[in-house]
Amino acid sequence: MEDIRTILDRIDYLVEAKETYVQAKLPYSRTDLAPVKSKETLDYHYGTLHKAYVDKANAGEGGDFQKAGAFLHNLYFPQFKKPGGANNPTGSSLELVERVHGSYDSFKEEFTNIAMGIQGSGWAYMDTKGSIKTIANHKVVNNIALLVD
């Protein structure tokens, strides 16, 4: 998992560049995340849905929904890495999780419960202060440290 400062820098960059959307390049192949995310899942969510958000946002279609979809997916996909080892947060990200939630396991349980409670389209994320929050449908926010679709 990336250091929180790297994530915040990426958010600042994306917010500043919000008028033109570019689909973030994947830092892994579409088969690298198996078995957590299959190639078919990535083909559909990245190759079809994310691309459509970017294309429609740049064409001025769909307003904030498309812009937020492009923005949020550009945060979502680059945060993953090929499975290996524990794949747990480290550094300042882990310190934040432990300070606010007590342990990474407690955080995972709370995060999963909140994320699974989202009805329809939406996102769960940990903000830069360690709180777990949700976004119903799509809305651009700039305090995201960890994002789960």
Which ranges hold each PLM region?
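Charge-dense, intrinsically disordered terminal/linker segments
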Residues: 1-20
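Feature for soluble, non-membrane regions of globular proteins
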Residues: 17-149
